[in-house]
């Protein structure tokens, strides 16, 4: 026990995601009722969404902000629809065993919250840089896990408190440049010309994200196959070897690069390798884009 009530608002409103308890907002002292679950889920999105409107307000270009918000909201709602339908539909493997799943796929979920609320949270926490959880992402259905991972790999929807939606802004720069070339005029955005220097920075920032994810995942996969003694000395890493084990490693580096923090927790990641490698990926994925945007 501890000052949980004081930490939860900071965790949620600040898109920080680090819970007082190890199981985060699955814990009844951190998220006791369905009402607190709704408030905490709302708190994740309120400031990242507000930043889009603040952009339009301060630049006096509200229509631009509305269009950006519309694209982000569409992507978010599409993810919510997929995850909620997947989780409330239940697991077909359990159906085949003749076991009723009236409440949906409840593995890794809290009974007081249910499958739909957990699915909603899983999308909300990955479209932002929050990373808090109210259920186990590792136990969600395959398509739900894909949406969670895809949200962080795209790494543009809503963003988070601190840097806002800077990655979406980078995609805007690239899109404006390409569209300017297509119509045969000098690309401009917000009255500023977009030239070779801006495009080089935008390209580096855009390509860095998948680069650090894939390099980290490939290194982990290589060590697991070719250095089994090293992996065993660290505790074995994978509790789910095979296809899902690769997904767990990919999710880990994706989450770090996106400054998210959620995980497929079947991965034993509290080891020297994972702490150091994820720390490096976190620094590169966080600070290089900030420097690029400022430049």
Where are these regions (language model features)?
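Membrane-proximal intracellular helices of multi-pass ion channels
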Residues: 1-295
């Amino acid at each position: 026990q501890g000052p949980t009530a004081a930490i939860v608002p900071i965790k949620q409103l600040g898109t920080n995601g680090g819970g007082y308890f190890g199981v985060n907002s699955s814990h009844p002292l951190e998220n006791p009722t369905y009402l607190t679950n709704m408030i905490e889920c709302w708190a994740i999105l309120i400031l990242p969404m507000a930043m889009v409107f603040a952009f339009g307000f301060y630049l006096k270009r509200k229509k631009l902000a509305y269009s950006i918000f519309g694209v982000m909201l569409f992507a978010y709602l599409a993810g919510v629809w997929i995850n909620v339908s997947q989780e409330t539909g239940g697991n077909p493997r359990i159906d085949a065993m003749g076991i009723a799943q009236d409440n949906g796929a409840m593995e890794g979920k809290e009974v007081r919250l249910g499958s739909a609320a957990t699915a909603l949270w899983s999308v909300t926490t990955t479209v932002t840089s929050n990373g808090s959880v109210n259920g186990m992402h590792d136990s969600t259905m395959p398509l739900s896990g894909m949406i969670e991972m895809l949200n962080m790999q795209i790494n543009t929807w809503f963003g988070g408190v601190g840097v806002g939606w800077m990655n979406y802004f980078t995609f805007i720069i690239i899109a404006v440049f390409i569209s300017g070339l297509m119509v045969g005029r000098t690309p401009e955005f917000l009255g500023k010309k977009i030239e070779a220097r801006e495009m080089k920075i935008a390209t580096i920032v855009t390509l860095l994200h998948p680069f650090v994810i894939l390099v980290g995942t490939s290194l982990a996969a290589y060590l697991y196959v070719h250095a089994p003694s090293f992996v065993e000395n660290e505790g074995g890493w994978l509790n789910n070897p095979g296809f899902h084990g690769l997904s767990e490693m990919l999710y880990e580096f994706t989450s770090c690069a996106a400054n998210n923090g959620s995980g497929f927790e079947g991965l034993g990641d509290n080891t020297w390798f994972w702490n150091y490698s994820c720390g490096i990926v976190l620094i590169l994925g966080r600070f290089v884009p900030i420097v690029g945007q400022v430049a």
